[in-house]
């Protein structure tokens, strides 16, 4: 089964002869609207930004296409996290344009940007949970603020916790969770409302390899089964290996599995952007990155 055939994640595990869930219309997330696929999910056009006279970003241009994961690599201070803050409208560029879902947000006020942020899920390095709230209350926080009826809130919270394989922890407090579990709760909270764009800011930093792998698998599920567009900021090459060499499918038993066959399928929807001193020094596939002769890239690859 290809990633196209498995574009929807089944709740009940029943698969038709065509390989699609019998309840595709009731997927974990909404079905894909193809009418706007030609419009990039995110686009930077010659973006420049300075802090204290130093250019943090220098004429930065790139696109994240629909359903694509853009993996941004680079050392500390190269502008990776600044890029995410600009997408969220937390910072404004000195020059250039930033478009989200085809909408120019460059000069949006705090009020104007709010409807754009609702389209975006944000996953922080530490999960950013409220320690005084239970897992249920953390994931439900946005829904409670919006006044959603409690029955609907519970259904949505359980749906998201099932997606990250943590429904059993619904009544636990953050202090009872491991670091990896906290990150997964943070992912569940970010996915409430079915955002079609997700930002990952160093989501595996400080985690052991098996737990980091779990976080990458969740990113792959979003990319391959839910058609989510994302930016995945990292400095860890293991993340690159997972995201660029495997893809998620639903097997005949209705389980999500990760395949290595047909690697080219993954390379189409996972692209690498390497930054240095606020500029793009590489954009392409992971295979091309490993063949690059640039001394900085080679040193980065050897050090990771």
Named regions from a protein language model:
Residues 103-104, 144, 151-169:
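Conserved ABC ATPase "signature" region
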